[in-house]
Every structure is written in structure tokens, then in C-alpha cells.
């Protein structure tokens, strides 16, 4: 009897329809300019597909990600796109897009940011800091590049990688951010080592796929560097919401790199901005010298800390200085502060944003919307 039951069921099993494979979601560019025909393909963590297998099947692969993302970027035809969406090893595919720096204005004037983050009250003209000054810590500036020959870096800066058409900083934004982090005159952490990773071109913009490639590079490269007091990544860039960029930022953070990112300059909730909306990184809003939220600064629950961002003077290309504004200028204050605190106290990447919040000066800022922290960065020196 048992054999006859099995025999009766078997034809039904053989006749059952084969389930349609799941189709991987196609994520469109949100709040950013899409790049036609270019995509970021995220593979499942358990994928059997393999990058080498992908290269043999897809001639348009451009960037391969192995650390902060399991996947690659590629130029795809509509046919290749749809074929990949049906591949069981593909988790999602996201349209590549243009992201850009978060600096908005230029004007003459001296910086005040260093004095503000080293005193509880406004009005001081001196920057107070421990002489350890971030020694032994390393900061990667993921930006337009760093002019490492600028004399104010004293030989502690190196431009090491480019995903743009040129390696040098032809814009100035990355050099400015690096100067706020660790230059002799304008820097928060005056003994830190700085590494430039160029992901934005000389107009200040670049593709999402190149930004992720730069982050992937940092996750790998830091393992070969002598950074006994830990590693920081400073990202003064952003655009619309990107799941791929947020995941890359989260994985870079979880790998042991403290990641500071700009909240953005749209005077709106940063929840739809990447990488600012990634909850595990440290998202930075900007203030002016009167302790008012900068008119351009984004806000919202994803913002972790505020720092000086209006009229900040720092290093510039050509061995010069420049005074500009943006959450781009606030972010390197926090990247530099993290390096300073790593050098002074130690600690972990995962705990550093909380440490900066604990140290911060509370409830002195104005024009802070409801639901946004009222925390101004402070280095604890006075």
C-alpha cells in the first residue's frame, strides 16, 4: 500500500509548476542625477556567482567591491540588466548617480571654528588642545583629493588614490577639509596622518559607484597603514538617498573606521540624504559663529552633532588658504576631533560618536528644529 501511495503522488509532484525566480529590485536614483546605463549590482552575501564569473558574463564591469559591499558597478544594456535581476545571486541593483561636495559659499575672513570647539562659551580667541594632537591616528579624506605638498601639512598628508581622471586636487574642497582635520595652522588634530582618496572630479562631483569604490579602498588600505591610534574617514559629500552608499558607509564603520559625514546643505531633514541618513555613522550639521544653526544646514533625527561650518578658513590648492561654508566644513571638525580623541583617550570606532556627543556643549544653539539634537562639538580641553 505504501508503495502505491508514493507512486500515486509522484506524477503530481512532477507535474507541479516550477516557481518563478524572485526578481531583484531595481532602485532608482532619488534626489540625485542618474547616470544612464550605469548600475551598482549588490550580490547576496552567500552568493555563489563570484566576481570572476561576473566578469566573464558581463563585459561592462567597471568597479569591483569586496569590503564595504559585495558586488560591482557596470554599464549594462537593458537585456543585461533584466538578466541580472533574475539571477538568484543578485540582491539588488541600484542606478548609479552623481553626488557632490557640500560646500556652498566663499567669502573673506578668519576662522573661528577651532576656538569654538575648545571652549564652552563663545568669545575666546585661542584654540586650546592637548599636545598629543591626534598623533598615531590616521584620517582618510574621501573627497576631491588633497594637495599633499601644501606646507601647512608638514609632510603628514599623502594623496594615495584616485577614481577620477586626475589624481591631484584641482578643486580645493578636499584640501580645505584636510586642513581643518590636521594642518598645522587650521587643523583640529595637528599631528594626525592624512590620506587623500579622490572620488570627486575637479568640478566637485562624482559618481556614486566611484564613491563606493573609494570607501571599499579605505577598508582594505587601512590594514597596511601604521595607525596605532585608530582610523577615521571624513566624507564631506552627499546627494539623494542611496541604499548602496548607506550600506557601504555602515560596513566601513563596522570594520573599525570612524566615519564622519556631512548632513547636507538643503535646509531640510537629512533623512533622504546619503550617506547622512545611515544611522551607524556620525552625521554632522553646521553652525555659525553666533551659535545659530547655519541657514543651509540640514537637520533631523539622523543628525548626531553640530560643528562650526560657516566662514571656515583652511588650506587651499596652490599653497593658499580659502574661507568657505557648508556642512562640508563642519564634518572635518568632527573627523579631526575623533582623531584627536583617539590619540588622547583611545576608544573604539563604534563608541566615538557617542563620546563626542557626551563631551558636547548642550542646548546653546538656536534655530534647531524639534527632534534634532542641540549638541555643539567640544574637545574637553578647557
Curated annotation (Swiss-Prot):
Keywords: Disulfide bond, Hydrolase, Protease, Secreted, Serine protease, Signal, Zymogen. GO terms for molecular function: serine-type endopeptidase activity. GO terms for biological process: proteolysis. The keyword Hydrolase applies. Optimum pH is 9-10. Its EC number is 3.4.21.-. The active site is at residues 143, 173, 328. SUPFAM superfamilies: Protease propeptides/inhibitors, Subtilisin-like. It is an enzyme of class 3 (hydrolase). Residues 16-102 form a propeptide. Residues 111-382 form the Peptidase S8 domain. Residues 1-15 form the signal peptide. Disulfide bonds join 138-227, 282-353. Inhibited by phenylmethylsulfonyl fluoride (PMSF). Optimum temperature is 60-70 degrees Celsius. One of its GO terms (cellular component) is extracellular region. Its main location: secreted. Belongs to the peptidase S8 family. Serine protease which can degrade the nematode cuticle. This is Alkaline serine protease ver112. It comes from Corniculantispora psalliotae. The lineage of its organism: Eukaryota, Fungi, Dikarya, Ascomycota, Pezizomycotina.
